[in-house]
Amino acid sequence: MIPRLSLALMMLGTATLHAQITPAEYAARRDSLSARIGDGVVIAFGGRTPITDFGPFYQLPAFRYLTGYEYADAALVMVVRGGRGSPTLFVHRSTPRRSLYYGAEPDSGALARDLRLPSRTAAELPAAMDSLARTGLPIYHLADFEAADFAAQDSLTRGRVFVRDLAARHPGLTVRDAHPIVNQLRARKSDAELALIRKATEISVEGHMELMRRAEPGMHEYDLQAIIEYAFRRGGAERPAYGSIIGSGPRASQLHYMKDRGPLNPGEVVVIDAAAEFGGYATDITRTLPVNGTYSREQRALYQVVRDGQAAAERNSRPGLSIQAALDSSIDVRARGLASLGLIESATATFDPPWPADCTRTPRSCQQVSLWAIHGITHGLGLEVHDPIQAYFGDRTFQKGDAFVIEPGLYITTRQLDILPDTPKNRAFKARVRAAVDRYQNTGIRIEDVYLITERGLEWISRAPREIDEIEAMFRSRTRAIP
């Protein structure tokens, strides 16, 4: 008997889901990019072979989006004239020594057949780009400007240096960043992409439920990390979609805490922000759990405020609705909830900031709610865990093909009060809320779920328990052994 995987899934195989993004879809993406560029030369760099610690290879997302090529040290060059592109993939040829280290890689015939892309050797790339630079066409780069691999000496995998050197050899060459165009294309997810996000989310939900069944006082954060990441791999994920954040007690209020070393103490909550990647597509789920299986009165109250804020955003996340309406509705609900708990003076009360200019950033910059609600509540999902969504562009509304999260949080810690300047207004505020802050001190609550905008409207797909009673029921059914 195969645990937790249906026979039907095993018969279909993981490769079937990966293959849902067809060569024709990759070609259509390149065609869309070509149409927007008109005339120019696109050069997109893939990720490099890890050479320092022999870690896992990660393909750069823009390159993967346009090619589907999953091997290292490659580049796509596409000559675009009149809105029509002619692509070529530059790849390292497999050698016996390279195969010994990294396994066999496809030959040019296999690439042409499987990806519908003609190929040349990576060694030919500099000369090819020099020739194209002399045509006078502008260069549109998708280089690894934000990747942490600048120490590599190979100019192919070090895209930033390659583009810089190309421009230096050809004075007057026009160089443009193609990322804004590609990001806008990536924002609308195809049915095949949504299927991969669904699968990544399904695996992640099972991981969270496995963790709920096994977490108990006396464990450490790394025990929970091991349980959930094991469940991800067992479910078919390539890896976690990002560094797992497992923070209990005071660490629950550290947004990107990743040490995952602390103990799980009775009476505390633990934030579990962890999810899987499948077929190159990421998802993102967070739950906040009671270590001993039951929320305290204060934890329940604060948790419900966060959950209500999430529900408000859900009601305002529909095709054609403004992303700002979702954000505003969530913060309004949380502000009223915080006021009812005595953690702020009123839903619209303000404070004096450390620097007066802080109040001009957003209409809510100096509202007291922003001391405890300290981050945004949505981002896209896709080839990156923070992927673009269509609401980032144009009229800023949700549209069919969006994949995104809603992740409100509240984090109560006295350090937020300590950063306020000593003014009469702030002294009065702190005096009024100090007792409540002490009661809720070191309580961090975040709930994060995954949603799709489809022809049916909003669809919630990360269906791990999230209501208080559901979570406590899961803890009552927990077991100990890991299968």
Language model: regions and residue ranges:
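General helical secondary-structure elements
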Residues: M1, T14, E25-Y26
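Positively charged n-region of N-terminal signal peptides that target proteins for export
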Residues: M1-L5, L327
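Bacterial N-terminal signal peptides
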Residues: R4-T16
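Active-site neighborhoods and metal-handling regions in enzymes and metal-associated proteins
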Residues: H18-P483
